[in-house]
C-alpha cells in the first residue's frame, strides 16, 4: 500500500489542484508543482496556511541532550512538537480546514524527512475531510502544540540541534527582538 497523501486548504469544494511555482526558494524546486504531505507529517499543516510555525521531531541521530532540551518532559509521550506564536492562538482555534486526500500514484517524494510529495501535473483529490478543531486534530496525533511569544529563539535552537525540523511561514512571525519590522 502506498503513502496516504493530503493537500490541506482553508477552501472547500476544490475539484482539481493545478501546479504552481513554490513560493519559497528554500524548497529547491523551481518548476510548478502540486504539493502534498504524507500522513506522518500532516500535523505540520493542521493550521491556517499563513500561521508561522516551527515543527520538530526526533531523528535517528538526535542526541539525548537535544531531545531533553527541545522536546522537554513530554518528549517521551509525544512524537513531535508544533510551536506557534501565542498571538495566533485564536485564529488556530477558530480555523476550519479541508484535508483533500490525494492519489499517491500521481506524486513523487520531494523531501522524505518533511513528508513532502510533488506532482508536475493537475491532480484531482480522491475525497475531502473537514477539520473543525485544529488543536484536537494535532493533539490526537500525539503531537504537542506549544505556544510561545516569539518563534525566533526556538527556531534558532531547533536549527542548531540534531532534530528533524520544518520552519514554515516564518515571514509571518513576529519580528526578531532588536530588529525593525
Task: List each model region and its residues.
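ADP-ribose/NAD+-binding catalytic cleft of ART/PARP-like enzymes
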Residues: 1-31, 48-49
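Conserved NAD+-utilizing ADP-ribose enzyme module
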Residues: 47-181
